[in-house]
Amino acid sequence: MKYLDVRLPEFANEFQQVLSRGKMDMKEVSSLVQELLDEIRTEGLDALKKHIARFDKWEVKSFEDLRISPKECLNAYNQLSSELKSALHLAYDRIYAFHRKQKMQSWIDCEENGNILGSKFTPMERAGLYIPGGKAAYPSSLLMNAIPAIVAGVKEIVVCSPTPHNQANPLVLAALHLCGITEVYKVGGASAIGLMAYGCKEIPKVDVITGPGNIFVACAKKLVFGEVNIDMVAGPSEIAIIADSQANPLYIAYDLLSQAEHDEMASSILISDSAPLIESVQKHIEQILPSMPRAEIAGASIKNRAVMIYTRNLQESIEIANAIAPEHLEVLTTTPFDTLPYIKHAGAIFLGEHSSEPIGDYLAGPNHTLPTGGSARFFSPLGVEHFMKKSSIIAFSATALEEVGESCALLAQSESLSAHAQAVLTRLDSIKSKRE
């Protein structure tokens, strides 16, 4: 892991590497991804068969082979222990309750002159959710992507998830049953994104695609944007922790490792004005890491992507965190809420020593699909709004048009758009003639 000290002259250059973490160079994969997307667009099911044989190592003989039936999902759910069922239901209920508060309501404003203005919020008709299935398959990702769509009122929700060697993850199947999703396809990678974006003879296209994935999935989402809407282009997972001298180093070590075990490319960053704390955290990581089930993955992440940043004071720690704009930001200080007004850029903010980032991953309620790689400066967490669209409502009365019509025509004429102006002036003439 790297150790950076803001006091040293080389800090600025070294910190630039932290700011460029998670940046995905898609040049090397974009041509392959575009080729796969083009094949899906033109060949449909035949292309899917080729791609699945190539990447997931099993043979698709018919369209039905691609589908996961509701019965399979029910069977997987029934085979769960009662404790795991309860945990899934608890997560579902908490995530649903949080996202229900996000749902936007249509509104109309009626002015005295009869002018009516408003916004109408409508759910997307068909949403596509991508659920990873590589080194680990996450039922939590299914819940986090499906529940906002359910709350939004999306009528048709389709899920695509890879099944290497035609083996589906039973926990994901159980979560599908819990969410009531019945249209599920055993397709992964760029092929899945293409299938949902373009559709084929057997499967209609979707309106929006959400969900995390590897660089091929991210590249495919970027390429199909405009054909459909997407949530964001996300990269490897990351965490930054602001901590003072009173923070618990063992808590910090586990929270950093919780990101490192996701992926070799995950970033774990500690920002503190306490050198003894940083040293203690490093020692705890060294002690814990060898016994972790995913020690190889976590070890590679810690070795190559973990950073300890030693600052002068808490204010500087906050400034560093804002520059990083992390996916997850923990604040482990004596008075964490005092820092909240000064935090500008983070996907999710965890305040206090009991607000461990994994709580947010599973069942706190807020979504765990978050912007990465510094994109929290302009992207937001996945939410109900990603599955809804807004239409403006405009209804002018004759009186309202008379009040502003000439100004509107003048603006149109200033832009040399004569038909725009005449469309308004003709109506004004008609209103005047009726009154005469």
UniProtKB/Swiss-Prot annotation:
Substrate binds at residues 237, 259, 262, 328, 361, 415, 420. The keyword Hydrolase does not apply. One of its GO terms (biological process) is L-histidine biosynthetic process. Its cofactor is Zn(2+). Zn(2+) binds at residues 259, 262, 361, 420. Keywords: Amino-acid biosynthesis, Histidine biosynthesis, Metal-binding, NAD, Oxidoreductase, Zinc. GO terms for cellular component: cytosol. Gene3D superfamilies: 1.20.5.1300, Nitrogenase molybdenum iron protein domain (3.40.50.1980). Pfam families: Histidinol_dh. It catalyses: L-histidinol + 2 NAD(+) + H2O = L-histidine + 2 NADH + 3 H(+). One of its GO terms (molecular function) is zinc ion binding. The active site is at 327 (proton acceptor), 328 (proton acceptor). Its EC number is 1.1.1.23. CDD domains: Histidinol_dh. Coiled coil: none annotated. Belongs to the histidinol dehydrogenase family. Catalyzes the sequential NAD-dependent oxidations of L-histidinol to L-histidinaldehyde and then to L-histidine. This is Histidinol dehydrogenase. The lineage of its organism: Bacteria, Pseudomonadati, Campylobacterota, Epsilonproteobacteria, Campylobacterales.
